[in-house]
Amino acid sequence: MESGSMKTPLVNNQEEARSSSSITCGLLLSTSVAVTGSFVYGCAMSYSSPAQSKIMEELGLSVADYSFFTSVMTLGGMITAAFSGKIAAVIGRRQTMWIADVFCIFGWLAVAFAHDKMLLNIGRGFLGFGVGLISYVVPVYIAEITPKAFRGGFSFSNQLLQSFGISLMFFTGNFFHWRTLALLSAIPCGIQMICLFFIPESPRWLAMYGRERELEVTLKRLRGENGDILEEAAEIRETVETSRRESRSGLKDLFNMKNAHPLIIGLGLMLLQQFCGSSAISAYAARIFDTAGFPSDIGTSILAVILVPQSIIVMFAVDRCGRRPLLMSSSIGLCICSFLIGLSYYLQNHGDFQEFCSPILIVGLVGYVLSFGIGLGGLPWVIMSEVFPVNVKITAGSLVTVSNWFFSWIIIFSFNFMMQWSAFGTYFIFAGVSLMSFVFVWTLVPETKGRTLEDIQQSLGQLS
Protein backbone atom coordinates (compact mmCIF):
# COMPACT_ATOMS: atom_id res chain seq x y z
CA MET A 1 0.00 0.00 0.00
CA GLU A 2 2.62 2.18 0.78
CA SER A 3 4.19 2.62 -1.26
CA GLY A 4 4.36 3.37 -0.86
CA SER A 5 3.65 2.93 0.28
CA MET A 6 7.27 2.59 -1.18
CA LYS A 7 9.09 5.52 -2.49
CA THR A 8 10.72 5.70 -6.01
CA PRO A 9 13.44 8.33 -6.27
CA LEU A 10 14.45 10.77 -8.97
CA VAL A 11 16.76 9.20 -11.49
CA ASN A 12 17.93 10.22 -14.90
CA ASN A 13 16.51 7.90 -17.53
CA GLN A 14 18.12 9.43 -20.60
CA GLU A 15 20.31 6.52 -21.69
CA GLU A 16 18.77 4.08 -24.13
CA ALA A 17 20.52 1.47 -26.20
CA ARG A 18 18.62 0.18 -29.19
CA SER A 19 20.74 -2.92 -29.40
CA SER A 20 20.45 -3.93 -25.76
CA SER A 21 16.73 -3.61 -25.02
CA SER A 22 16.14 -7.25 -24.09
CA ILE A 23 15.29 -9.18 -20.95
CA THR A 24 18.08 -11.54 -19.87
CA CYS A 25 18.63 -13.95 -16.98
CA GLY A 26 21.17 -11.55 -15.51
CA LEU A 27 18.65 -8.71 -15.56
CA LEU A 28 15.92 -10.85 -14.00
CA LEU A 29 18.23 -12.14 -11.27
CA SER A 30 19.51 -8.67 -10.37
CA THR A 31 16.00 -7.23 -10.27
CA SER A 32 14.71 -10.14 -8.18
CA VAL A 33 17.44 -9.69 -5.59
CA ALA A 34 16.87 -5.93 -5.44
CA VAL A 35 13.09 -6.13 -5.01
CA THR A 36 13.55 -8.50 -2.10
CA GLY A 37 14.13 -5.19 -0.32
CA SER A 38 10.71 -4.03 -1.47
CA PHE A 39 9.25 -7.21 0.02
CA VAL A 40 11.00 -6.41 3.32
CA TYR A 41 9.53 -2.90 3.15
CA GLY A 42 6.00 -4.27 2.70
CA CYS A 43 6.41 -6.64 5.65
CA ALA A 44 7.72 -3.86 7.90
CA MET A 45 4.95 -1.47 6.92
CA SER A 46 2.09 -3.88 7.61
CA TYR A 47 3.51 -5.78 10.60
CA SER A 48 1.74 -3.49 13.04
CA SER A 49 -1.69 -4.51 11.71
CA PRO A 50 -1.89 -8.19 12.78
CA ALA A 51 0.35 -7.62 15.82
CA GLN A 52 -1.58 -4.74 17.38
CA SER A 53 -3.99 -6.46 19.75
CA LYS A 54 -1.48 -8.97 21.16
CA ILE A 55 1.34 -6.45 21.62
CA MET A 56 -0.95 -4.00 23.39
CA GLU A 57 -2.28 -6.78 25.61
CA GLU A 58 1.04 -8.46 26.50
CA LEU A 59 3.11 -5.31 26.99
CA GLY A 60 0.31 -3.18 28.42
CA LEU A 61 0.54 -0.46 25.78
CA SER A 62 -1.98 2.36 25.52
CA VAL A 63 -3.41 3.61 22.22
CA ALA A 64 -0.89 6.46 22.30
CA ASP A 65 1.99 4.02 22.97
CA TYR A 66 1.03 1.80 20.06
CA SER A 67 0.48 4.74 17.74
CA PHE A 68 4.01 5.89 18.51
CA PHE A 69 5.41 2.37 17.99
CA THR A 70 3.72 2.11 14.61
CA SER A 71 4.73 5.59 13.46
CA VAL A 72 8.33 5.61 14.75
CA MET A 73 9.34 3.58 11.70
CA THR A 74 8.41 6.52 9.49
CA LEU A 75 10.56 8.82 11.64
CA GLY A 76 13.52 6.47 11.15
CA GLY A 77 12.78 6.30 7.45
CA MET A 78 12.66 10.08 7.24
CA ILE A 79 16.16 10.34 8.75
CA THR A 80 17.89 7.90 6.39
CA ALA A 81 15.85 9.02 3.39
CA ALA A 82 17.36 12.49 3.79
CA PHE A 83 20.85 11.04 3.24
CA SER A 84 20.05 8.00 1.10
CA GLY A 85 20.98 9.67 -2.19
CA LYS A 86 24.39 10.69 -0.90
CA ILE A 87 25.02 7.31 0.73
CA ALA A 88 24.13 5.41 -2.45
CA ALA A 89 26.33 7.74 -4.50
CA VAL A 90 29.36 7.29 -2.23
CA ILE A 91 29.36 3.57 -1.37
CA GLY A 92 27.29 2.17 -4.24
CA ARG A 93 23.80 0.74 -4.68
CA ARG A 94 24.59 -2.83 -3.61
CA GLN A 95 26.43 -1.78 -0.46
CA THR A 96 23.56 0.54 0.49
CA MET A 97 21.08 -2.34 0.19
CA TRP A 98 23.39 -4.48 2.33
CA ILE A 99 23.52 -1.83 5.08
CA ALA A 100 19.72 -1.52 4.91
CA ASP A 101 19.44 -5.26 5.56
CA VAL A 102 21.69 -4.95 8.63
CA PHE A 103 19.41 -2.24 10.03
CA CYS A 104 16.31 -4.32 9.33
CA ILE A 105 17.69 -7.52 10.88
CA PHE A 106 18.63 -5.66 14.05
CA GLY A 107 15.20 -4.04 14.08
CA TRP A 108 13.28 -7.30 13.70
CA LEU A 109 15.36 -9.00 16.41
CA ALA A 110 14.81 -6.10 18.81
CA VAL A 111 11.05 -6.26 18.23
CA ALA A 112 10.98 -10.04 18.61
CA PHE A 113 12.76 -10.01 21.97
CA ALA A 114 11.28 -6.79 23.37
CA HIS A 115 9.76 -6.92 26.83
CA ASP A 116 9.09 -3.21 27.19
CA LYS A 117 8.06 -0.39 24.92
CA MET A 118 11.56 1.13 24.81
CA LEU A 119 13.18 -1.83 23.03
CA LEU A 120 10.05 -2.24 20.93
CA ASN A 121 10.35 1.35 19.71
CA ILE A 122 14.12 1.05 19.16
CA GLY A 123 13.56 -2.00 16.97
CA ARG A 124 10.83 -0.29 14.99
CA GLY A 125 13.08 2.75 14.58
CA PHE A 126 15.90 0.62 13.17
CA LEU A 127 13.42 -0.91 10.74
CA GLY A 128 12.72 2.66 9.67
CA PHE A 129 16.43 3.29 9.08
CA GLY A 130 16.54 0.22 6.85
CA VAL A 131 13.41 0.83 4.81
CA GLY A 132 14.33 4.51 4.44
CA LEU A 133 17.41 3.40 2.51
CA ILE A 134 15.45 0.72 0.66
CA SER A 135 12.83 3.22 -0.47
CA TYR A 136 15.51 5.14 -2.37
CA VAL A 137 18.14 2.68 -3.50
CA VAL A 138 16.02 -0.22 -4.82
CA PRO A 139 14.14 1.85 -7.44
CA VAL A 140 17.39 3.62 -8.38
CA TYR A 141 19.16 0.33 -8.94
CA ILE A 142 16.32 -1.12 -11.01
CA ALA A 143 16.04 2.02 -13.15
CA GLU A 144 19.79 2.00 -13.80
CA ILE A 145 20.07 -1.64 -14.87
CA THR A 146 16.89 -1.88 -16.98
CA PRO A 147 16.54 -1.04 -20.70
CA LYS A 148 14.23 1.91 -21.26
CA ALA A 149 11.72 -0.20 -23.19
CA PHE A 150 10.98 -2.23 -20.05
CA ARG A 151 11.64 0.36 -17.36
CA GLY A 152 8.00 1.10 -16.51
CA GLY A 153 7.09 -2.53 -15.87
CA PHE A 154 10.32 -3.36 -14.06
CA SER A 155 9.98 -0.26 -11.88
CA PHE A 156 6.50 -1.40 -10.89
CA SER A 157 7.97 -4.69 -9.68
CA ASN A 158 8.74 -2.57 -6.62
CA GLN A 159 5.03 -2.15 -6.00
CA LEU A 160 4.42 -5.83 -6.72
CA LEU A 161 6.87 -7.05 -4.07
CA GLN A 162 5.70 -4.45 -1.57
CA SER A 163 2.17 -5.74 -2.08
CA PHE A 164 3.37 -9.31 -1.69
CA GLY A 165 5.05 -8.40 1.61
CA ILE A 166 1.90 -6.69 2.87
CA SER A 167 -0.26 -9.64 1.76
CA LEU A 168 1.96 -12.20 3.42
CA MET A 169 2.00 -10.24 6.67
CA PHE A 170 -1.80 -9.83 6.64
CA PHE A 171 -2.26 -13.56 6.04
CA THR A 172 0.44 -15.11 8.25
CA GLY A 173 -0.33 -12.67 11.06
CA ASN A 174 -3.52 -14.67 11.64
CA PHE A 175 -1.50 -17.78 12.54
CA PHE A 176 1.78 -16.70 14.15
CA HIS A 177 2.55 -14.99 17.45
CA TRP A 178 3.88 -11.46 16.99
CA ARG A 179 7.36 -12.44 18.19
CA THR A 180 7.54 -15.37 15.77
CA LEU A 181 6.27 -13.13 12.99
CA ALA A 182 9.10 -10.65 13.64
CA LEU A 183 11.72 -13.42 13.57
CA LEU A 184 10.34 -14.83 10.30
CA SER A 185 10.39 -11.33 8.79
CA ALA A 186 14.15 -11.12 9.33
CA ILE A 187 14.77 -14.11 7.04
CA PRO A 188 14.30 -12.24 3.70
CA CYS A 189 16.83 -9.65 4.89
CA GLY A 190 19.44 -12.37 5.40
CA ILE A 191 18.65 -13.93 2.03
CA GLN A 192 19.10 -10.60 0.26
CA MET A 193 22.39 -9.94 2.09
CA ILE A 194 23.81 -13.20 0.69
CA CYS A 195 22.39 -12.79 -2.81
CA LEU A 196 23.76 -9.25 -3.17
CA PHE A 197 27.23 -10.79 -3.59
CA PHE A 198 26.05 -12.46 -6.81
CA ILE A 199 24.62 -9.47 -8.71
CA PRO A 200 26.51 -6.62 -10.39
CA GLU A 201 26.80 -3.03 -9.25
CA SER A 202 24.82 -0.37 -11.12
CA PRO A 203 26.49 0.49 -14.46
CA ARG A 204 25.92 4.18 -13.86
CA TRP A 205 27.60 4.10 -10.46
CA LEU A 206 30.61 2.35 -12.02
CA ALA A 207 30.76 5.05 -14.70
CA MET A 208 30.61 7.77 -12.04
CA TYR A 209 33.86 6.44 -10.58
CA GLY A 210 35.59 5.75 -13.90
CA ARG A 211 35.58 1.96 -13.54
CA GLU A 212 35.38 1.41 -17.30
CA ARG A 213 36.31 -2.27 -17.42
CA GLU A 214 33.76 -3.18 -14.74
CA LEU A 215 31.14 -1.08 -16.55
CA GLU A 216 31.49 -3.13 -19.73
CA VAL A 217 31.57 -6.45 -17.88
CA THR A 218 28.43 -5.49 -15.95
CA LEU A 219 26.56 -4.48 -19.10
CA LYS A 220 27.49 -7.81 -20.67
CA ARG A 221 26.04 -9.63 -17.65
CA LEU A 222 22.84 -7.60 -17.80
CA ARG A 223 22.35 -7.56 -21.59
CA GLY A 224 23.72 -11.01 -22.47
CA GLU A 225 26.90 -12.09 -24.20
CA ASN A 226 25.40 -11.35 -27.62
CA GLY A 227 24.27 -7.85 -26.70
CA ASP A 228 25.99 -4.88 -28.32
CA ILE A 229 26.66 -2.70 -25.29
CA LEU A 230 29.02 -0.14 -26.85
CA GLU A 231 26.32 2.43 -27.61
CA GLU A 232 24.70 2.04 -24.20
CA ALA A 233 28.06 2.33 -22.43
CA ALA A 234 28.84 5.52 -24.36
CA GLU A 235 25.45 7.04 -23.52
CA ILE A 236 25.86 6.16 -19.83
CA ARG A 237 29.25 7.90 -19.78
CA GLU A 238 27.80 10.94 -21.52
CA THR A 239 24.82 11.14 -19.16
CA VAL A 240 27.04 10.76 -16.08
CA GLU A 241 29.32 13.52 -17.33
CA THR A 242 26.33 15.78 -17.98
CA SER A 243 24.98 15.07 -14.50
CA ARG A 244 28.39 15.83 -13.01
CA ARG A 245 28.48 19.21 -14.75
CA GLU A 246 24.89 20.20 -14.04
CA SER A 247 24.09 18.71 -10.63
CA ARG A 248 25.98 21.21 -8.49
CA SER A 249 22.81 23.07 -7.64
CA GLY A 250 21.48 22.99 -4.09
CA LEU A 251 18.24 23.59 -2.27
CA LYS A 252 18.31 27.28 -3.18
CA ASP A 253 18.26 26.47 -6.89
CA LEU A 254 15.29 24.14 -6.46
CA PHE A 255 13.08 26.94 -5.17
CA ASN A 256 12.89 29.18 -8.22
CA MET A 257 10.13 29.89 -10.72
CA LYS A 258 11.55 27.51 -13.32
CA ASN A 259 11.11 24.57 -10.96
CA ALA A 260 7.87 25.76 -9.34
CA HIS A 261 5.56 23.52 -11.39
CA PRO A 262 7.60 20.30 -10.95
CA LEU A 263 7.96 21.05 -7.23
CA ILE A 264 4.20 21.55 -6.82
CA ILE A 265 3.58 18.27 -8.64
CA GLY A 266 6.14 16.41 -6.52
CA LEU A 267 5.13 17.62 -3.09
CA GLY A 268 1.43 17.71 -3.97
CA LEU A 269 1.31 14.09 -5.09
CA MET A 270 3.23 12.97 -1.99
CA LEU A 271 0.85 14.83 0.32
CA LEU A 272 -2.27 13.54 -1.41
CA GLN A 273 -0.92 9.98 -1.57
CA GLN A 274 -0.58 9.90 2.22
CA PHE A 275 -3.49 12.10 3.29
CA CYS A 276 -5.99 9.88 1.48
CA GLY A 277 -5.27 7.45 4.34
CA SER A 278 -3.22 4.78 2.58
CA SER A 279 -0.62 4.28 5.32
CA ALA A 280 -3.35 3.92 7.94
CA ILE A 281 -4.98 1.09 5.97
CA SER A 282 -1.68 -0.80 5.78
CA ALA A 283 -0.72 -0.20 9.40
CA TYR A 284 -4.09 -0.75 11.08
CA ALA A 285 -6.13 -2.98 8.74
CA ALA A 286 -6.95 -5.56 11.43
CA ARG A 287 -8.02 -2.85 13.87
CA ILE A 288 -10.25 -1.27 11.21
CA PHE A 289 -12.11 -4.55 10.72
CA ASP A 290 -12.42 -5.09 14.47
CA THR A 291 -13.86 -1.66 15.18
CA ALA A 292 -16.39 -2.16 12.38
CA GLY A 293 -17.54 -5.47 13.88
CA PHE A 294 -16.09 -7.68 11.12
CA PRO A 295 -13.70 -10.59 11.87
CA SER A 296 -10.20 -9.20 11.30
CA ASP A 297 -8.68 -12.56 10.28
CA ILE A 298 -11.18 -12.94 7.45
CA GLY A 299 -10.94 -9.29 6.43
CA THR A 300 -7.15 -9.15 6.25
CA SER A 301 -7.07 -12.47 4.39
CA ILE A 302 -9.39 -11.01 1.75
CA LEU A 303 -7.08 -8.01 1.36
CA ALA A 304 -4.07 -10.35 1.16
CA VAL A 305 -5.65 -12.29 -1.70
CA ILE A 306 -6.31 -9.26 -3.91
CA LEU A 307 -3.12 -7.22 -3.40
CA VAL A 308 -0.70 -9.26 -5.51
CA PRO A 309 -2.93 -9.88 -8.60
CA GLN A 310 -3.83 -6.20 -8.63
CA SER A 311 -0.15 -5.20 -8.65
CA ILE A 312 0.64 -7.62 -11.47
CA ILE A 313 -2.11 -6.12 -13.63
CA VAL A 314 -0.90 -2.56 -12.98
CA MET A 315 2.71 -3.54 -13.73
CA PHE A 316 1.68 -4.38 -17.30
CA ALA A 317 -0.78 -1.48 -17.66
CA VAL A 318 1.39 1.46 -16.61
CA ASP A 319 3.13 1.85 -19.99
CA ARG A 320 -0.09 1.29 -21.95
CA CYS A 321 -2.78 3.39 -20.28
CA GLY A 322 -0.83 6.53 -19.40
CA ARG A 323 -0.22 8.21 -16.07
CA ARG A 324 -3.09 10.71 -15.91
CA PRO A 325 -5.97 8.28 -16.62
CA LEU A 326 -4.70 5.85 -13.98
CA LEU A 327 -4.15 8.59 -11.39
CA MET A 328 -7.59 10.13 -11.94
CA SER A 329 -9.33 6.74 -11.91
CA SER A 330 -7.48 5.90 -8.72
CA SER A 331 -8.54 9.16 -7.07
CA ILE A 332 -12.22 8.73 -7.92
CA GLY A 333 -12.15 5.12 -6.73
CA LEU A 334 -10.53 6.14 -3.43
CA CYS A 335 -13.12 8.88 -2.94
CA ILE A 336 -16.05 6.49 -3.44
CA CYS A 337 -14.54 3.69 -1.35
CA SER A 338 -13.52 5.98 1.53
CA PHE A 339 -17.09 7.25 1.59
CA LEU A 340 -18.39 3.66 1.72
CA ILE A 341 -16.08 2.79 4.63
CA GLY A 342 -17.21 5.91 6.47
CA LEU A 343 -20.83 5.03 5.72
CA SER A 344 -20.39 1.56 7.23
CA TYR A 345 -19.21 3.14 10.48
CA TYR A 346 -22.03 5.67 10.40
CA LEU A 347 -24.67 2.95 10.00
CA GLN A 348 -23.38 1.15 13.10
CA ASN A 349 -25.16 3.80 15.16
CA HIS A 350 -28.46 3.23 13.36
CA GLY A 351 -30.07 -0.07 14.33
CA ASP A 352 -32.29 -0.37 11.26
CA PHE A 353 -29.27 -0.58 8.94
CA GLN A 354 -26.66 -2.50 10.95
CA GLU A 355 -26.95 -5.63 8.80
CA PHE A 356 -25.53 -3.62 5.89
CA CYS A 357 -22.40 -2.49 7.76
CA SER A 358 -20.17 -5.51 7.10
CA PRO A 359 -20.92 -5.85 3.36
CA ILE A 360 -20.41 -2.12 2.82
CA LEU A 361 -17.12 -2.22 4.77
CA ILE A 362 -15.74 -5.14 2.76
CA VAL A 363 -16.71 -3.56 -0.57
CA GLY A 364 -15.20 -0.26 0.55
CA LEU A 365 -11.89 -1.68 1.78
CA VAL A 366 -11.40 -4.04 -1.18
CA GLY A 367 -12.24 -1.22 -3.57
CA TYR A 368 -9.90 1.11 -1.68
CA VAL A 369 -6.96 -1.27 -2.00
CA LEU A 370 -7.63 -1.84 -5.70
CA SER A 371 -8.08 1.88 -6.40
CA PHE A 372 -4.91 2.86 -4.55
CA GLY A 373 -2.88 0.23 -6.36
CA ILE A 374 -3.80 1.32 -9.88
CA GLY A 375 -2.58 4.89 -9.48
CA LEU A 376 -1.67 6.76 -6.32
CA GLY A 377 0.22 3.79 -4.91
CA GLY A 378 3.17 3.84 -7.30
CA LEU A 379 2.66 6.35 -10.11
CA PRO A 380 3.63 9.48 -8.13
CA TRP A 381 7.15 8.07 -7.91
CA VAL A 382 7.24 7.21 -11.62
CA ILE A 383 6.23 10.78 -12.44
CA MET A 384 8.84 12.16 -10.04
CA SER A 385 11.59 10.49 -12.04
CA GLU A 386 10.42 12.39 -15.11
CA VAL A 387 9.59 15.99 -14.16
CA PHE A 388 12.70 17.42 -12.46
CA PRO A 389 15.68 18.79 -14.43
CA VAL A 390 19.05 17.08 -14.06
CA ASN A 391 20.60 19.89 -12.02
CA VAL A 392 18.09 19.52 -9.15
CA LYS A 393 17.28 15.80 -9.32
CA ILE A 394 19.24 14.74 -6.23
CA THR A 395 18.06 17.69 -4.13
CA ALA A 396 14.47 17.29 -5.29
CA GLY A 397 14.58 13.53 -4.73
CA SER A 398 15.70 13.96 -1.13
CA LEU A 399 13.08 16.63 -0.43
CA VAL A 400 10.22 14.66 -1.96
CA THR A 401 11.21 11.42 -0.24
CA VAL A 402 11.57 13.03 3.19
CA SER A 403 8.25 14.82 2.68
CA ASN A 404 6.52 11.54 1.90
CA TRP A 405 7.87 9.93 5.06
CA PHE A 406 6.80 12.96 7.10
CA PHE A 407 3.26 12.94 5.68
CA SER A 408 3.09 9.19 6.34
CA TRP A 409 4.12 9.73 9.98
CA ILE A 410 1.35 12.31 10.46
CA ILE A 411 -1.32 9.88 9.23
CA ILE A 412 -0.04 6.79 11.06
CA PHE A 413 0.42 8.58 14.38
CA SER A 414 -2.87 10.49 14.30
CA PHE A 415 -5.12 7.77 12.86
CA ASN A 416 -6.07 6.07 16.15
CA PHE A 417 -6.89 9.43 17.72
CA MET A 418 -8.97 10.41 14.68
CA MET A 419 -10.89 7.13 14.95
CA GLN A 420 -11.61 7.84 18.62
CA TRP A 421 -12.89 11.27 17.61
CA SER A 422 -15.13 10.00 14.79
CA ALA A 423 -14.66 6.82 12.77
CA PHE A 424 -17.02 7.83 9.96
CA GLY A 425 -15.72 11.41 10.02
CA THR A 426 -12.17 10.16 9.50
CA TYR A 427 -13.07 8.36 6.29
CA PHE A 428 -15.23 11.19 5.02
CA ILE A 429 -12.12 13.38 5.36
CA PHE A 430 -10.11 10.80 3.38
CA ALA A 431 -12.85 10.85 0.73
CA GLY A 432 -12.56 14.63 0.49
CA VAL A 433 -8.78 14.45 0.09
CA SER A 434 -9.17 11.83 -2.65
CA LEU A 435 -11.54 14.15 -4.52
CA MET A 436 -8.96 16.92 -4.19
CA SER A 437 -6.42 14.51 -5.67
CA PHE A 438 -8.56 14.11 -8.79
CA VAL A 439 -8.77 17.89 -9.22
CA PHE A 440 -5.02 18.24 -8.62
CA VAL A 441 -4.13 15.67 -11.29
CA TRP A 442 -6.68 17.07 -13.74
CA THR A 443 -5.34 20.62 -13.48
CA LEU A 444 -1.62 20.30 -12.76
CA VAL A 445 -0.14 16.89 -13.63
CA PRO A 446 0.92 16.42 -17.28
CA GLU A 447 0.81 13.17 -19.21
CA THR A 448 4.37 11.85 -19.45
CA LYS A 449 3.78 8.57 -21.26
CA GLY A 450 5.74 8.36 -24.51
CA ARG A 451 7.49 11.72 -24.07
CA THR A 452 11.20 12.34 -23.70
CA LEU A 453 12.48 13.74 -20.43
CA GLU A 454 13.69 16.85 -22.24
CA ASP A 455 10.22 17.49 -23.69
CA ILE A 456 8.51 17.03 -20.32
CA GLN A 457 10.93 19.27 -18.44
CA GLN A 458 10.93 21.96 -21.12
CA SER A 459 7.13 22.15 -21.16
CA LEU A 460 6.96 22.38 -17.37
CA GLY A 461 9.62 25.09 -17.35
CA GLN A 462 7.62 27.15 -19.83
CA LEU A 463 4.48 26.87 -17.68
CA SER A 464 6.26 27.96 -14.49
From Swiss-Prot:
It is found in: Membrane. InterPro entries: MFS_dom (IPR020846), MFS_ERD6/Tret1-like (IPR044775), MFS_sugar_transport-like (IPR005828), MFS_trans_sf (IPR036259), MFS_Trehalose_Transporter (IPR050549), Sugar/inositol_transpt (IPR003663), Sugar_transporter_CS (IPR005829). SUPFAM superfamilies: MFS general substrate transporter. Keywords: Membrane, Sugar transport, Transmembrane, Transmembrane helix, Transport. It is a multi-pass membrane protein. Pfam families: Sugar_tr. It comes from the Eukaryota. PROSITE patterns: MFS, SUGAR_TRANSPORT_2. GO terms for cellular component: membrane. The chain crosses the membrane at residues 23-43, 72-92, 95-115, 125-145, 156-176, 180-200, 263-283, 298-318, 326-346, 359-379, 399-419, 424-444. Its main location: membrane. Belongs to the major facilitator superfamily. Sugar transporter (TC 2.A.1.1) family. Sugar transporter. PANTHER family: PTHR48021, SUGAR TRANSPORTER ERD6-LIKE 1-RELATED. This is Sugar transporter ERD6-like 1.
